[in-house]
Amino acid sequence: MARFFYDSYSVLAYLSDSPGYAAYFEKNTGVLTRLNLMEIYYAILRVHGATAAHEVLEAYSAREIEFSLLDVETAMKLRYELRKLELSYADAMGYHIAKKEGLKFLTGDKAFEGLPGVEFIP
């Protein structure tokens, strides 16, 4: 069973039944940070309301991986190095955590296409 870092994009794509994502969530395991949980909650809240957002938050909170102040520094340095990609704080942290933990970074975000350690689903 493979382990992945689930970018917010991938979770929202899976929840929207986008092609190609089901196997990564149903046959594998993955983690995400609290920053991703915040992005996902807000995206669901805007479209489906507070009840649906809360249900998704509850469902994915068990997959949360914490990060340290050293992770903050490293992720923001990485964000600076990749500034042409215009990564969000959450994206930079997630990509850093994936690399640190030896996980594939699962996303469909075009900014990550072709980067090392990324499992990109168009």
Model-derived features with residue positions:
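Acidic, PIN/NYN-like endoribonuclease modules and their adjacent C-terminal/linker elements
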Residues: 1-2, 95, 99-122
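Short, well-structured N-terminal submotif of metal-dependent ribonuclease cores
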Residues: 1-32, 43-55
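Histidine- and aromatic-rich ligand-binding microenvironments
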Residues: 6-7, 32-34, 87-88, 109-110
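A generic structural signal for short hydrophobic patches within well-formed alpha-helices
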Residues: 11-12, 37, 112-113
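Active-site regions of enzymes building and remodeling cell-envelope glycoconjugates
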Residues: 29-32, 62-63, 115-122
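Amphipathic alpha-helical segments within well-ordered protein domains
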Residues: 38-41, 57, 76-79
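Short, hinge-like loop/turn segments at secondary-structure boundaries
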Residues: 47-51, 82-83, 121-122
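Active-site neighborhoods of divalent-metal-dependent phosphate/nucleic-acid chemistry enzymes
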Residues: 65-104
